């Protein structure tokens, strides 16, 4: 009788693992978030700890259910099963939804130290924007680039850091172009300014100023530079003054 009970327990454990694996297959390979989540919740309710963090990731990333996702991340942490990519996702949730910089960085550092390369660029961005730790931010941006995971938002802030903090206009161009070409709209105006002021590439600069305006993100400094380009390079004083006025109205 004892042996039969043991075999039954092992069979249940195997079944739960199969349920978890099917959930991950549905989510990652078949891109069926709803069905994948359903299987993972079944596995989690049966006590399969590996599912906790995955549920948190799906709820946050795919369904934007931050509070429920946080409950699953906390559950994973309490059971010592918060794996690196879940720690990363939890850190980003805390940053964007809770505004808790220190707690966010704690989880991002935890994930990065365990090899989650996705965290590198975001750590650099937060250190730069929120803590003004320029040199440390620079190191994390470099780590992200070396790991081939410097994605558009981090590339933009890396380029911005190089312009604003280091005065390295030429070097910044590479990162601003990367961010802009990958569709990060915040980069458009900055790229236009660098191309105009540093490279004197008038046509290319104007193209990016126009893209920034079309995207509704032509901010005051770039509006000013666009206005000056129109006046000095195109002789279009009327249009140029409109952009200078916009920059002035926005406090530039």
Predicted regions: what they are:
Residues 14, 46-49, 79-83, 114-117, ...:
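Short helix-capping/linker turns of helical repeat alpha-solenoids
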Residues 14-42, 46, 57-60:
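Alpha-helical segment of the N-proximal tetratricopeptide repeat
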Residues 18, 51-52, 86, 119-120, ...:
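TPR alpha-solenoid repeat register
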Residues 24-25, 57-58, 92-93, 125-126, ...:
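Residue-level recognition of tetratricopeptide repeat
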